[in-house]
């Protein structure tokens, strides 16, 4: 029931992303190269990745505790005026991945996407700091937003797998991490959110049956 949900306090851990949209008018092809020529009209910056998940959750639950990383001022600006989101910054020194999408302003079509870097690399100190903060807060439930940007590896991944708490997984495949960010690295989850391609990559199958997926459904969970 919605009234019950509105009283919930949830915990989210994941990688932040800046979704940058540059709207352009397509004016033709350049004269010296076979390249599309566009005229920039406006730019929008939106909090993506785990920031988007936190903003959506904050609109209908009592409190969101967000475990993420990056420049504090940038995170605050991207989250907007949401007083019920408490940020636990795991590594303030880490850059936030930015994905720029060039959009045909007349048709709304995406022309090309550019990403500023492929993944983050965390120092031993960053990892230990992240582990300490997660243990200290002892979350009763944990939504994991894994976009393959480097947070969920090695010791932190092992800790999450061993946490005695309900875990809800969103493990994303994209063009940069294709084939390298699979849900099979996780154990003991209560909920799993994947699309068809992500299932096929993880199970190494071109076609899927209900039986293929059934074995990965938790006894008291959902996919």
Question: Can you say where each PLM-predicted feature lies in the sequence?
Answer:
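Ribokinase/PfkB-type carbohydrate-kinase core domain
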Residues: 1-223
